[in-house]
């Protein structure tokens, strides 16, 4: 949600920020609605004040036995006027809100211009890509040959974009999630949190998933939503709160199932585990004071990078351009892992700062240490990492000519010392 005061102060700058994302100008229309609302509020307050004084005047006349008919008639008219003005204020409030909630966050000045992912900027690249002595295979070919990755049974059970993992691959997926959680909790200072996968509409709205992405999420018949990411319950846990400055930064991490309808993804990544309706993901969320959020964004991204470094997966950090930055983000770093089977870099983590965009939607604030009035917090979120995609990266980077997969050293303590996954 945007700050109306900032819009009123500089409507041209507001529209320029929208233009960076390819959005049409909106400031003049919203400012006009806001002027109408403020005028209606002033008129309402004047009428309410007059009603209060009128009540005293009528009472005084009645006590002296004088005629109060004219004043009583005025009171009737005032009541009608107040009711109409109250309706008008509510309608204008709703109209302004409807305009604001569909507008994306204002981008950081350092976000590069560009319409799509082709304009994203490589910040750095880490790790050497392995030189294979054989043609590397994609993860689904490896998994099916091992007899441990079953898309046919998943299709029978649930349809397309699901998978059944068995044996050592299922164990490796579990090991990856546990390894990531342990790293973030024990070394990075996050608090492990177990969250519901069903949330209410307010939680989805507050984390900017509604109304914009309603068609990309699953809604239950009773009006609740399956979470597309644990960012939703973690971030929404501070909705409506006023946190003490001493409680910041608040760092939380969760491993959860995530659910996405993948609307608009027809024909993309139809084979394998890259794009699924249900998947596991470790999510990091930080709640900070405004002055600390940029440093926290870098810190969070480094926490995600550490996972890839411990696993020995080559990766690169990308700064997303204006046209590729998500709706609620002010700035986003994507981490892309090298997948030799695809001969391509693929996103495995996305770390974003939303500044106060989500906080305004959910009224999440903190009280500064100097005793000043409450201010909106800043919220950040990042994948630490997507477990299924990390499994893909491990399989493709650690595959052997005979189709077996070497288990990375970092995962062996979680797999009872298993050194390699071979065909059953």
Curated annotation (Swiss-Prot):
Quick one: which residues bind L-serine?
Answer: 229-231, 283, 383
Q: In which pathway does it act?
A: Aminoacyl-tRNA biosynthesis; selenocysteinyl-tRNA(Sec) biosynthesis; L-seryl-tRNA(Sec) from L-serine and tRNA(Sec): step 1/1
Q: What does this chain do?
A: Catalyzes the attachment of serine to tRNA(Ser). Is also able to aminoacylate tRNA(Sec) with serine, to form the misacylated tRNA L-seryl-tRNA(Sec), which will be further converted into selenocysteinyl-tRNA(Sec).
Report the domain remarks: Consists of two distinct domains, a catalytic core and a N-terminal extension that is involved in tRNA binding.
Q: What is this protein called?
A: Serine--tRNA ligase
Highest taxon of source? Bacteria
**Organism of derivation:** Gluconacetobacter diazotrophicus (strain ATCC 49037 / DSM 5601 / CCUG 37298 / CIP 103539 / LMG 7603 / PAl5)
Catalysed reaction, written as an equation? tRNA(Ser) + L-serine + ATP = L-seryl-tRNA(Ser) + AMP + diphosphate + H(+); tRNA(Sec) + L-serine + ATP = L-seryl-tRNA(Sec) + AMP + diphosphate + H(+)
| TM regions (residue ranges) | none
How does it associate, per the subunit comment? Homodimer. The tRNA molecule binds across the dimer.
Q: Which GO terms describe its biological process?
A: selenocysteine biosynthetic process; seryl-tRNA aminoacylation
């Amino acid at each position: 949600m945007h700050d109306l005061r900032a819009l009123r102060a500089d409507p041209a700058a507001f529209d320029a920020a929208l233009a960076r994302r390819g959005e049409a100008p909106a400031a003049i229309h919203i400012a006009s609605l806001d002027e109408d609302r403020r005028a209606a509020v002033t008129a309402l307050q004047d009428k309410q004040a007059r009603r209060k004084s009128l009540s005293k005047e009528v009472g005084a006349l009645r006590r002296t036995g004088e005629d109060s008919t004219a004043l009583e008639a005025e009171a009737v008219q005032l009541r009608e006027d107040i009711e109409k003005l109250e309706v008008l204020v509510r309608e204008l409030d709703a109209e302004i809100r409807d305009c604001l909630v569909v507008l994306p966050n204002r981008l950081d000045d350092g976000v590069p211009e560009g319409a799509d992912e082709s304009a994203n900027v490589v910040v750095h690249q880490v790790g050497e890509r392995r030189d294979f002595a054989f043609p590397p295979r994609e993860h689904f070919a490896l998994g099916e040959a091992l007899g441990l990755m079953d898309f046919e049974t998943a299709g029978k059970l649930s349809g397309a974009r699901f998978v059944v993992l068995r044996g050592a691959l299922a164990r490796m997926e579990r090991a990856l999630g546990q390894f990531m959680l342990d790293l973030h909790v024990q070394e990075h200072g996050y608090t492990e949190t177990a969250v519901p996968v069903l949330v209410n509409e307010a939680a989805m709205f507050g984390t900017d998933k509604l109304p914009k992405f309603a068609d990309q999420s699953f809604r239950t018949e009773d009006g609740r939503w399956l979470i597309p990411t644990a960012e939703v319950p973690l971030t929404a846990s501070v909705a409506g709160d006023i946190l003490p400055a001493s409680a910041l930064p608040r760092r939380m991490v969760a491993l959860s199932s995530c659910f996405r309808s993948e609307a608009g993804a027809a024909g993309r990544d139809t084979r394998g585990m890259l794009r699924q309706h249900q998947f596991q993901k470790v999510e990091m969320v930080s709640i900070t004071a405004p002055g600390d959020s940029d440093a926290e964004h870098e810190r969070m991204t480094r926490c995600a990078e550490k996972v890839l470094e411990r696993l020995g997966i080559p990766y690169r950090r990308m700064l997303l351009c204006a046209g590729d930055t998500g709706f609620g983000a002010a700035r986003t770093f994507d981490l892309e892992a090298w997948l030799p089977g695809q001969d391509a870099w693929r996103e495995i983590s996305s770390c974003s700062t939303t500044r106060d965009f989500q906080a305004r939607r959910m009224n999440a604030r903190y009280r500064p240490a100097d005793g000043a009035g409450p201010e909106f917090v800043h919220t950040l979120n990042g994948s630490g990492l997507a477990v299924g995609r990390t499994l893909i990266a491990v399989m493709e980077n650690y595959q052997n000519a005979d189709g077996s997969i070497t288990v990375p050293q970092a995962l062996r303590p979680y797999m009872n010392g298993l050194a390699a996954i071979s065909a059953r």
